[in-house]
């Protein structure tokens, strides 16, 4: 298992580092690769999306590094090491952001650290269009052991405050079987250019996820852009079921990663469905190369491409 998933991470690292700088957090030194910086920090797990900084950038290029509390998806798993990574990186002058901010940090880098550790929020639980709208799911943000006793209204106001959002669109259906996160939106619905939403669908009425995904689709049809127009909806196929013993795994094509000039897309050795998913994603990103990454080894850990990465603004 370790060798299999290590090979997958190597492939992801190569594809990213070909196009942009890469920062890897690891517990020990490793052989360097081009455009890659290694930071030696212990962690509980590999899901950088959920404990990494959420970065806001204004029109003048100033960055705000939001450090929210990560508590192992509602205290399901240990998280104390993961929850300390952001502060450690910041003290080391990482991530390497634009010098537009002041004062500069260690190593001459910059960016304003914002302590949001009194509020639980995972990066995989939100999607933003960069124009004032943030999408999230009620299943995740209102789940026990995250931000109780805060109400939905109080949580929404905090999201608007910290993320500088004008509105929050809540998705009430769609949690995938085997998803430990209580319904992260990055497994279900992704925002793409031209007000396009790529979302997971299911055409098999006998599939246990069929009803929830159908209800999610119906809700998405009611959503409007901040300008009052319907979103352009594109449905992604559902991979045929993966199991770990008797447990179904949350395989999804929505967990793709947008990088410079490319989109890295999870595949599952299902040529027909993989090709269909890559075609649909390619239609949403016509100016980017679409690169498939076999993520069968990662999905065995109940995550995928987007889950194990977190982007930062370029220098």
Protein language model regions, located:
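The feature marks the mature, well-folded catalytic cores of soluble enzymes
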Residues: 1-101, 111-315
């Amino acid at each position: 298992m370790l060798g299999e998933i290590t090979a997958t991470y190597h492939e992801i690292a190569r594809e990213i580092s070909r196009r942009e700088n890469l920062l890897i957090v690891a517990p020990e030194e490793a052989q360097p690769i081009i455009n890659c910086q290694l930071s030696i920090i212990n962690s509980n797990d590999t899901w950088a999306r959920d404990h990494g900084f959420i970065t806001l950038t204004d029109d003048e290029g100033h960055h705000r590094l939001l450090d929210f509390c990560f508590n192992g998806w509602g205290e399901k798993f240990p998280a104390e090491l993961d929850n300390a990574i952001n502060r450690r990186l910041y003290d080391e002058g990482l991530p390497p952001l634009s010098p537009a901010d002041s004062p500069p940090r260690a190593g001459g880098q910059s960016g304003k650290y914002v302590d949001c550790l009194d509020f639980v929020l995972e990066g995989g639980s939100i999607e933003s269009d960069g124009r004032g709208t943030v999408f999230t799911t009620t299943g995740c943000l209102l789940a026990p052991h995250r931000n109780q006793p805060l109400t939905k209204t109080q949580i929404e106001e905090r999201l608007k405050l910290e993320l500088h959002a004008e509105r929050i669109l809540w998705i009430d259906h769609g949690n995938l079987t085997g998803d430990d996160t209580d319904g992260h939106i990055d497994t279900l619905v992704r925002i793409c250019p031209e007000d396009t939403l790529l979302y997971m669908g299911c055409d098999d009425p006998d599939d246990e996820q069929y009803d929830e995904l159908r209800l999610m689709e119906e809700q998405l049809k009611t959503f409007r852009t901040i300008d009052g127009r319907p979103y352009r909806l594109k449905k992604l196929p559902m991979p045929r079921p993966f199991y770990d013993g008797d447990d179904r795994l949350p395989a999804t094509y929505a967990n793709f990663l947008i990088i410079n000039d490319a989109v890295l897309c999870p595949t599952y050795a299902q040529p027909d469905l993989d090709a269909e998913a890559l075609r649909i994603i390619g239609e949403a990103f016509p100016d980017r190369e679409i690169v498939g990454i076999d993520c069968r080894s990662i999905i065995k850990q109940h995550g995928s491409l987007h889950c194990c990465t977190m982007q930062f603004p370029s220098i």
